[in-house]
C-alpha cells in the first residue's frame, strides 16, 4: 500500500486493552467483543478464548497477556481496525499489564456492579493514567441480583474522578451493552500517532519460542513500516536479523504483507537465541535505524526468591532449558545456578510474588515434565558489614556471620487494602502482627474503608493475602508496591537435624519473633520427618546458641522376639548389639527430608 493509504488507515485504528480487578469479568467481555465483531466463527467460540494456557482455564485467571486484531463496522458507516490486548488482573502480574498498556492508546476499565472498585482496580487505573491512556469505564454484571450500578457509577466519579455520563452499563455474560461499548471505543480511544514514512520503531511487548520457527515476537509499530525481507536490528543488543514473516493474530496467526504505524502483530526473523528478542526492546531497520529507542516500560525486579531443585539430578540441564524458555515471555523471571548440600544442584529463582512463583513451578512440572523441590521463598536483604562493604543476600543460607554485620536492611512495601467496615479491627490487628506501621485510612462510603500500612515484604510474601482473606471472610482486596529498604533487627535461624545444618531450611527472622518461630518450626518438623531407626534431635539455632529442640523418636524393633524364656545374658547381648548398631547408624546415617518439610518454614504462622 502507498503512503497515503497508510495515513488513512492509521486514522481508523483503535488500540485498547481491558483492565480490571481479578474476577470482574474481563475475559468474558473480551469473548463478547470477539463474538460481536464476528472475529471468531461460532463453532470455534469457547469461554475465555484468549486464555490459551490450560492453567489459565483451570484457575479461571488470566496470566499472560494476549493481543488480537478485530474488524468493526461502526454506525458512522466506516470500518475500524481494533487491536484488543487482554491483560491479567492479579497483583503479581501487574508487569504484564504495564506491558500491554505500553502498546495502547486507550483502556476499558471494567468494574463489577456488585463489588464496586477494588484495590487492584485503582492500581491498574494509575498504571493506565501513567501511560496517558483514555479510560472508558464499564460497569459489568448489571444483571446480578446484588448489582448496584448507580452506586458504582457514583463511586467511579468520587474515587477516580470519571464522569458518570461516560459510564457504559453492561453484562458481558448476557451480551447486554456490548454494542454501546464498541461505539464508545471508536469515539473515546484516539487513533495512534506516528509517521509511516519515518524510520521503523516497533516495541516488543511479548515473545514466545516455537521449536520450528524460532522466536516469535509480538510487536506494536510506533513509527515506519516493516515487511518480510527487511533487515532489522534490535536496539538493545545491536544484533541484526532478516524478517521472514510478519502477521497478525485473529486469534490465530495470519501472515500479511506489512505492519505499519499503529499495527499490533507478530514478527518472525529466524531468531534462534532467546536472549536476542527481549521484551521491552525496540526493533528498527538495520540500514536506516531510528535515532533513539522507544522508552520501554520499567523493568520489574523480582521481589521473592526461592531455590528450585530437580528431584532427579539428571534433569538439571532440562530445568535450565525450561527456565530459559519461560523467561523469554516472562521478563520478570530471573535465575542463576546454586548448589545446596541437602538438595544438590538447582537454580536460585526470582519471582514477583507468591502466585507468580506457584504458576512458574506448575508450568515447569506440566509443560516440561520435570519434578521439582522448592525451598521456602525469601526476599532480598542488604547487609552493611563492619568494614563498610555491602552484601546483598537473597538466600538465607548465604547470610554472613552476625558478628561481622553492622546493620541489616529489608524491603518494605506500601500495602493498600480495601476492607468492609466490620473487619477494620481484624485487618489492623493482622498488620500489627506482621510488624506493619499504620499510614492512613479513608472511608470510601458507608461500607468500605481503604487502609494503608507499611509492612516488611518478608511478612507479606508468605501468607499475608490468605490471612487477610480469612480475616475478612473473603471481602478484602489487596495491592502492594515496594517503597524502600529499612533497617531491621534480623537474625538468621539455622535448623540442625542430627547435629547437621540443613542449609535449605535456614530462614531470616526478626529477633523478637525468633524464639517462637524456632519452637514452632522444630515441633512442625517433628511431625513431618519420618521416624528413623535411631533417635534424631531437631534443633533451631541462632549462631552457636540453640533456641529450641525436640527429638524424633526412633522406631522400635523388638530384637528379643525370638528369645523364648532363656538366659538374661543372651537377651542383654542382643540388646547391646542393637544399641551398637544404632550408634553406628546414627554416626553415618542421613535423614530423608520430605518436600513438605521445606515448605513448613512458610506455614508457621497458621498454628
Swiss-Prot record:
Any one GO BP annotation for this protein: positive regulation of translation
Membrane topology, from the record: Peripheral membrane protein
Record flagged with keyword Hydrolase: yes
Domain tr-type G: start-end pairs: 11-193
Enzyme class of the recorded protein, top EC level: hydrolase
EC numbers, comma separated: 3.6.5.n1
Catalytic activity: GTP + H2O = GDP + phosphate + H(+)
UniProt xrefs under Gene3D superfamilies: 3.30.70.240, Elongation factor 4, C-terminal domain, Elongation Factor G (Translational Gtpase), domain 3, P-loop containing nucleotide triphosphate hydrolases, Translation factors
Residues noted as binding GTP in the record, renumbered to the chain: 23-28, 140-143
Record GO terms (molecular function): GTP binding; GTPase activity; ribosome binding; translation elongation factor activity
Protein keywords: Cell membrane, GTP-binding, Hydrolase, Membrane, Nucleotide-binding, Protein biosynthesis
Protein function: Required for accurate and efficient protein synthesis under certain stress conditions. May act as a fidelity factor of the translation reaction, by catalyzing a one-codon backward translocation of tRNAs on improperly translocated ribosomes. Back-translocation proceeds from a post-translocation (POST) complex to a pre-translocation (PRE) complex, thus giving elongation factor G a second chance to translocate the tRNAs correctly. Binds to ribosomes in a GTP-dependent manner.
Protein name as it appears in the record: Elongation factor 4
